[in-house]
Amino acid sequence: MKYLIKHITAYKYASRVSHCYNLAQMIPRTTQRQTCINSKIEVTPELAMEQRREDYFGNQVFQFEIQRPHKALTITATSQVETRPQIADTNLDLGSTCAEVLSKMQQSKSEDVLLAREYQLDSSMIAAAPEFRDYAADLFTADRSLLSACFALTARIYEEFSYSPLATTIATPLSEVMQNKKGVCQDFAHLQIACLRSLGFAAKYVSGYLETLPPPGQEK
């Protein structure tokens, strides 16, 4: 399947801005399941400097600077992406058990495991804590498949938390989300990662695009 993705980010300032410096990560990655065939980023007003690079995690970073006064900024990223079918087994009980994964994370010296251990560590918005471990611990029994346990945790968060766009900001701590049981997708992703890391598993945040299909007869 081929997709043409157009992502527009626009800022309108209350007063004139004399200078701005930005990093944009708006280009889909090429992975085993998808290929970014081509992409471009257009910015208005005119740029004084631009540079592209790949960061530590493999993301494409577009760095730019504007040195003229402006009251609005528009960044338009256009990408053509081809995806490949995913062959997935719907039996969630298959795969390694929670105990097997934890043992491998602790004992294996393989390159993949050593790289994965980085995602056991705390990050700026996600810190392991007893409250997150206790919230999920009963789901991750030793002999249960890790995949099944992760799906169960996703279902628990979906059932027990309310989607509320005004309840949080990008700086709201997870402890507050946990207490109020409200937030948005970013908060719930952070919560699930915190639960997994608090139990000793490796987990990381991935963002992207989801294709949505409207009800019959309605526009997309």
What is the meaning of each model-derived region?
Residues 26, 94, 170-174, 202, ...:
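Flexible domain-boundary/linker segments
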Residues 30, 34, 45-47, 62, ...:
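Short, surface-exposed, charged/polar-biased interaction segments
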Residues 54, 179, 204:
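Short glycine- and Lys/Arg-enriched binding-loop motifs that mark or flank ligand-binding interfaces
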Residues 1-134:
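Linear, non-domain "peripheral" regions
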Residues 100-104, 109-183, 191, 198-199:
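Secondary-structure boundary elements
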Residues 35, 50, 179-183, 211:
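Alpha-helix boundary/capping detector
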Residues 20, 155, 161, 187-220:
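Hydrophobic/aromatic-rich core segments of domains that either
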